[in-house]
Design a protein with these regions (language model features):
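A generic structural signal for short beta-strands and their flanking turns/coil linkers
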Residues: 30, 73-75, 91
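Generic detection of short hydrophobic beta-strand segments and adjacent strand-loop junctions
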Residues: 32-34, 71-73, 104-109
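Generic structural motif
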Residues: 38-42, 54-57, 66, 70-81
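Short hydrophobic beta/alpha edge segments that flank linear recognition/processing sites
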Residues: 55-68, 91-99
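Buried, small/hydrophobic-residue-enriched core segments of structured protein domains
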Residues: 85-134
Length: 134
């Protein structure tokens, strides 16, 4: 027989003391890579070149078949390297992050006041559209 314990209406475990109130400093990497292979069905077209400055949210890649579908930069910084594989296939775009984060301003919107086309346009322009899976 297994030792299963069935709980009804929860279980209070008396633990003495309180949680330590401390936070850890976040660690942000120096170099971020945007990999087109992470986005299924995307045929990437490069929109930046080495040495270009990018802001978080600015487009880095676009789809060749649907140019309105964009992949945006997750950090602000400088494009340090464009890595290509066999037959010049685009493998990754490396971005060297700068000290502070600067963002592209897409404005604030209330979803209830927007039409479906406006929501779709905002998702396409700001980048999260490529992460949606149907």
């Amino acid at each position: 027989m297994s030792n299963n314990i069935d709980l009804k209406q929860g279980l209070n475990i008396p633990i003495s003391g309180a949680a330590v109130q401390k936070t850890r400093k976040t660690v942000s990497p120096d170099v971020i890579a945007v990999k087109p292979t992470d986005f299924k069905g995307l045929t990437p077209r490069l929109l930046v070149k080495e040495g270009d400055k990018v802001l978080a949210g600015s487009p880095v890649l676009a789809d060749k078949k649907n140019p309105e579908i964009l992949v945006t930069s997750p950090v602000s910084g400088t494009v340090s390297e464009v890595v290509r594989g066999e037959k010049r296939k685009l493998l990754e775009v490396k971005i060297k992050a700068d000290g502070q984060q600067e963002y592209v301003d897409f404005g604030t919107h209330k979803a209830s006041d927007m039409s479906a086309d406006e929501v779709k346009e905002l998702l396409l322009k700001s980048g999260p559209w490529v992460s949606l899976v149907q």
